[in-house]
């Protein structure tokens, strides 16, 4: 998370790759620059923004050490997700940029609950249009997170999907998806990718998705034809 930079003699924070330093959203000058860049793209005619890990732009200002889980690494998520000023920053973004253009906005929000989602994607339009949440994707998580061959228990998946449908009803908007570039293929994970059942599994998964309330997302992941990734 913390990387030493020899040129400046200082450490910088990166929640992901060391080539991706986290921006300091506490700094109003940084926010100004971000909003200026967004405005530039809006004036070029973009249709919207998919905001990567937007729930992580506000950190616990004390920067406490994360709990060591399974002797592997510190868990930063309680201190970087849904931080104390995240909604304040998004409302500022909305007022200064998003509300001035005809856009669609979706925020990738790791660690989000339905209660938090009601703020991010509230129907009064003060922040974003919708969120990408991960609770249904985490029903098989184990010691190594999503890196497992464990098949999901559909009872758990159904319970999570029902919760998001019911809790957001009339209060916020959700996105609908089964996989993406960070997740295993849906047919391999939630269905059966054998030659006999691959097609019917895909139809079953698609039917389930499109009968729910929300905006469906269908991604075409660049993988060699005929290669089915089980993880």
Predicted feature locations:
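Active-site and adjacent substrate-binding regions of carbohydrate-active enzymes
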Residues: 1-231
């Amino acid at each position: 998370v913390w990387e030493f930079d020899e040129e400046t003699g200082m450490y910088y924070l990166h929640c992901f790759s060391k080539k991706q330093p986290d921006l300091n959203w506490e700094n109003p000058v940084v926010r100004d620059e971000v909003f200026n860049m967004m405005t530039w793209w809006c004036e070029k005619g973009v249709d919207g923004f998919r905001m990567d890990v937007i729930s992580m732009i506000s950190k616990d200002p004390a920067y406490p050490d994360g709990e060591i889980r399974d002797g592997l690494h510190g868990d930063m998520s309680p201190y970087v997700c849904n931080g104390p000023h995240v909604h304040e920053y998004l409302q500022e973004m909305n007022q200064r940029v998003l509300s001035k253009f005809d856009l669609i906005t979706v925020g990738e929000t790791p660690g989000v609950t339905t209660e938090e989602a009601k703020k991010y994607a509230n129907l009064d339009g003060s922040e974003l249009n919708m969120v990408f949440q991960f609770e249904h994707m985490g029903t098989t998580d184990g010691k190594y997170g999503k890196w497992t061959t464990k098949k999901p228990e559909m009872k758990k998946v159904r319970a999570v999907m029902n919760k998001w449908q019911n809790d957001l009803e009339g209060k916020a908007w959700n996105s609908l998806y089964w996989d993406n570039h960070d997740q295993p293929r849906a047919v391999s994970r939630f269905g059966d990718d054998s030659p006999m059942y691959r097609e019917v599994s895909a139809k079953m998964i698609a039917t389930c998705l499109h009968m729910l309330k929300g905006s469906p997302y269908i991604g075409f992941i660049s993988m060699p034809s005929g290669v089915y990734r089980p993880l």
